[in-house]
UniProtKB/Swiss-Prot annotation:
CDD domains: HIV-1-like_HR1-HR2. This is Envelope glycoprotein gp150. It comes from Feline immunodeficiency virus (isolate Petaluma) (FIV). Specific enzymatic cleavages in vivo yield mature proteins. Envelope glycoproteins are synthesized as an inactive precursor that is N-glycosylated and processed likely by host cell furin or by a furin-like protease in the Golgi to yield the mature SU and TM proteins. The cleavage site between SU and TM requires the minimal sequence [KR]-X-[KR]-R. Keywords: Cleavage on pair of basic residues, Coiled coil, Disulfide bond, Glycoprotein, Host cell membrane, Host membrane, Host-virus interaction, Membrane, Transmembrane, Transmembrane helix, Viral attachment to host cell, Viral envelope protein, Virion, Virus entry into host cell. One of its GO terms (molecular function) is structural molecule activity. Glycans are attached at residues 220, 258, 269, 274, 298, 330, 336, 342, 418, 422, 448, 481, 499, 518, 531, 548, 551, 717, 721, 729, 737. Residues 662-680 are annotated as: Immunosuppression. The surface protein (SU) attaches the virus to the host cell by binding to its receptor. This interaction triggers the refolding of the transmembrane protein (TM) and is thought to activate its fusogenic potential by unmasking its fusion peptide. Fusion occurs at the host cell plasma membrane. The transmembrane protein (TM) acts as a class I viral fusion protein. Under the current model, the protein has at least 3 conformational states: pre-fusion native state, pre-hairpin intermediate state, and post-fusion hairpin state. During viral and target cell membrane fusion, the coiled coil regions (heptad repeats) assume a trimer-of-hairpins structure, positioning the fusion peptide in close proximity to the C-terminal region of the ectodomain. The formation of this structure appears to drive apposition and subsequent fusion of viral and target cell membranes. Residues 807-856 are cytoplasmic.
């Protein structure tokens, strides 16, 4: 074949034609590729030998010119060796291709790349020597640049994979801790709860909430017995009472005067004292008595600090109680409150008893009845008084009005009242402090507006049948000679007038103090003088306990009080603290546990058969504990933005719910709907104190499942009984209780690490130093901060645009050209904008051990 080729040197065959056309393209090639991209017809896929011969016949003149151009190259000129350059670029492409195959793991290519795509001839020629290129010939091409990046990325990837394998092997035996699991458990009786009240009509319970949305969800979970909200009834009642009167102490001043108090010897020896007397606006106190203190306002009690309420009746979880009528003063009638029959088990004296210490009567068939009774009162007054000049309206002239004098001793006042039904007060309890003796009843009476009187509401007390012996206790009944009892008739007959009086004060015990509220001035403000009438206005939900009375069959009789009537109600049975406690007994205080130790089997558990899905309802009030529990203001303000928060966190809820994979946890009590109020209840507050400790233990505030390294787990001698899981046949209470000790120990470990962590102390010190350095920023006005920040932001954006725009444009251009199948290069600069008539190809270097003629 070699002899035939030498015999006909003028004819150019397909093989030589293919190389000459490659040279023609390479003469205009730079680092970025050919200037005018062309297609070598001899390299078209699927071309046959016949087609190659036809191309040789057609392109023979062009091929002859290309051969002559190559042969006329002069050695002494410094033109770039285009042909050598093209061969180097071809080899560099193969290097990049080799790196790509190494990156994807296709190592067979590295061994067979020299055999792929090469045409082999069995000819008798000398073996070519290895070619050498200097750095100037090589330059820095795009292939070299991206090849280096590819190599660096490959090494980094394998390093990361190797590190991940090592980390996984080290943490395979780690203990799993579930932070803030979606379940609730009862609180301890020793825990402190933070609460606040809310009532839309009451300023003392409305100044920080605005509108309340009761977050509730139905659930069927079983919670073991724990403390209820009734355990804190006395503390809640005392706080509500202070709230009711706090507004009045900050109100307007009704009267002010100065008085001089003298001592026993007059003003001698500086025993005189000048006292400034300030009487506040009694209108405020009277409003409190008319509305809140007497329970005419519905009040909801809401917990803060991450605690929740579990209603044992409705099986619901919520932050707030249902609206309750909470009278803060003793009353004859009140909200539903039952009494207890077994008096031996009653430890709290405030709880009403259904028996009595000195009576043989037995009350059974007790039931709650609404107060379908009305009281009518008519006030009459003798007429001593005086004429008063008043202006009735701007249309009329001044006129004289008769105003009776109610302060005169000559004035005779009567306030008879009657009931619409018989009321028998069957027993007596220790009600008000300084209680009225005898048979008595009290109620609220409403006076309509008239020409001479304004609309008002008074508290009226009626008393009759007072016992004559004050050393004995007035007792309802007519059995004589009862030890320590003064028998009185406690029946208030219908349509019978009884002498009553306006209650101008009441006495309450707040904390350990007995406080007397004198309402005389407040009553005077409503113009009680004259003749007027009123009708009781008991709330519709109020009533009394009506019982049947049966005398005991005990043979020992005559020394105990028998039934005063066959039916009766319990007089003064409503005690505010006891009533509040009974209303709150149905609300169990629960919380979301901070940690739950989870066996590894739980995370890997696969149910054998399809089970019912566990629906987790997530109501988002995430800042309840952050808002400052117990401070009062804005403690539950997040509830008003519930809908906005729900829309914002909906995507996060779905991701977290999917990540928990609760369907794999076959807890008996968790196969129903469970409510989690807040994804991170108190998480932010706890993280502030346990950040460094949790970091050392392998957790952060954004993780719900944390794998504590086994080394740390064994260092603190913590073990978990893997058998408690029992393949999922465990209740919520059992799981929590069996790991409760470990949870407490885990919390103590966190506190111990936090207090003794050197890194934590160092971090705090560095934070303080940084704060000292940047403290001057706080002295800059706000508008200057905004202006400076805007200028820096714009400048940084322009700088990044200048630096990154060329690279971005080149990247986009290269991607487009790669998709099209070729690469466009830039035209080489030519001085004088004139193209040389003849572009000669020169070698910038020489081939190792080979002359120029031999190379050609």
């Amino acid at each position: 074949m070699a002899e035939g080729f030498a015999a006909n040197r003028q004819w150019i065959g397909p093989e030589e034609a293919e190389e000459l056309l490659d040279f023609d393209i390479a003469t205009q090639m730079s680092e970025e590729g050919p200037l005018n991209p062309g297609v070598n017809p001899f390299r078209v896929p699927g071309i046959t030998e016949k087609e190659k011969q036809n191309y040789c016949n057609i392109l023979q003149p062009k091929l002859q010119d290309l051969r002559n151009e190559i042969q006329e190259v002069k050695l002494e000129e410094g033109n770039a060796g285009k042909f050598r350059r093209a061969r180097f670029l071809r080899y560099s492409d193969e290097r990049v291709l080799s790196l790509v195959h190494a990156f994807i793991g296709y190592c067979i290519y590295l061994g067979n790349r020299n055999k792929l795509g090469s045409l082999r001839h069995d000819i008798d020629i000398e073996a070519p020597q290895e070619e050498c290129y200097n750095n100037r010939e090589k330059g820095t091409t795009d292939n070299i640049k991206y090849g280096r990046r590819c190599c660096l990325g490959t090494v980094t990837l394998y390093l990361i994979l190797f590190t991940g394998v090592i980390v996984y092997s080290q943490t395979a035996g780690a203990q799993v801790v579930w932070r803030l699991p979606p379940l609730v458990v009862p609180v301890e009786e020793s825990e402190i709860i933070f609460w606040d009240c809310w009532a839309p009509e009451e300023p003392a319970c409305q100044d920080f909430l605005g509108a309340m949305i009761h977050l509730k969800a139905k659930t069927n979970i079983s919670i073991r017995e724990g403390p209820t909200l009734g355990n804190w009834a006395r503390e809640i009642w005392a706080t509500l009472f202070k709230k009711a009167t706090r507004q009045c102490r900050r109100g307007r001043i009704w009267k002010r005067w100065n008085e001089t108090i003298t001592g026993p010897s007059g003003c001698a020896n500086n025993t005189c004292y000048n006292v400034s007397v300030i009487v506040p606006d009694y209108q405020c106190y009277l409003d409190r008595v008319d509305t809140w203190l007497q329970g005419k306002i519905n009040i909801s009690l809401c917990l803060t600090g991450g605690k929740m309420l579990y209603n044992k009746v409705t099986k619901q979880l919520s932050y707030c109680t249902d609206p309750l009528q909470i009278p803060l003063i003793n009353y004859t009638f009140g909200p539903n409150q039952t009494c207890m029959w077994n008096t031996s088990q009653i430890q709290d004296p405030e709880i009403p008893k259904c028996g009595w210490w000195n009576q043989m009567a037995y009350y059974n068939s007790c039931k709650w009845e609404e107060a379908k009774v009305k009281f009518h009162c008519q006030r009459t007054q003798s007429q001593p008084g005086s004429w008063f000049r008043a202006i009735s309206s701007w249309k009329q002239r001044n006129r004289w009005e008769w105003r009776p004098d109610f302060k005169s001793k000559k004035v005779k006042i009567s306030l008879p009242c009657n009931s619409t039904k018989n009321l028998t007060f069957a027993m007596r309890s220790s009600g008000d402090y300084g209680e009225v003796t005898g048979a008595w009843i009290e109620f609220g009476c409403h006076r309509n507006k008239s020409n001479l009187h304004t609309e008002a509401r008074f508290r009226i007390r009626c008393r009759w049948n007072v016992g004559s012996d004050t050393s004995l206790i007035d007792t309802c009944g007519n059995t004589p000679n009862v030890s320590g009892a003064n028998p009185v008739d406690c029946t208030m007959y219908s349509n019978k007038m009884y002498n009553c009086s306006l209650q101008n004060g009441f006495t309450m015990k707040v904390d350990d103090l007995i406080v007397h509220f004198n309402m005389t001035k407040a009553v005077e403000m409503y113009n009680i003088a004259g003749n007027w009438s009123c009708t009781s206005d008991l709330p519709s939900s109020w009533g009394y306990m009506n019982c049947n009375c049966t005398n005991s069959s005990s043979s020992y009789s005559g020394t105990k009080m028998a039934c005063p009537s066959n039916r009766g109600i319990l007089r003064n049975w409503y005690n505010p603290v006891a009533g509040l406690r009974q209303s709150l007994e149905q609300y169990q205080v629960v919380k979301q546990p901070d940690y739950l130790l989870v066996p590894e089997e739980v995370m890997e558990y696969k149910p054998r058969r399809k089970r019912a899905a566990i629906h987790v309802m997530l109501a988002l009030a995430t800042v309840l504990s952050i808002a400052g529990a117990g401070t009062g203001a804005t403690a539950i303000g997040m509830v008003t933005q519930y809908h906005q928060v729900l829309a914002t966190h909906q995507e996060a809820i779905e991701k977290v719910t999917g990540a928990l994979k609760i369907n794999n946890l076959r807890l008996v009590t968790l196969e129903h709907q469970v409510l989690v109020i807040g994804l991170k209840v108190e998480a932010m507050e706890k993280f502030l104190y346990t950040a460094f400790a949790m970091q050392e233990l392998g957790c952060n505030q954004n993780q719900f499942f944390c794998k504590i390294p086994l080394e740390l787990w064994t260092r603190y001698n913590m073990t978990i009984n893997q058998t408690i899981w029992n393949h999922g046949n465990i209740t919520l209470g059992e799981w929590y209780n069996q790991t409760k000790d470990l949870q407490q120990k885990f919390y103590e470990i966190i506190m111990d690490i936090e207090q003794n962590n050197v890194q934590g102390k160092t971090g705090i010190q560095q934070l303080q130093k940084w704060e000292d350095w940047v403290r001057w920023i706080g002295n800059i006005p706000q508008y200057l901060k905004g202006l400076l920040g805007g200028i820096l932001g714009i400048g940084l954006g322009v700088l990044l645009l200048i630096l990154c725009l060329p690279t971005l444009v080149d990247c986009i251009r290269n991607c487009i050209h790669k998709i099209l199948g070729y690469t466009v290069i830039a035209m080489p600069e030519v001085e004088g904008e004139e193209i040389q008539p003849q572009m000669e190809l020169r070698r910038n270097g020489r081939q190792c051990g080979m002359s120029e003629k031999e190379e050609e």
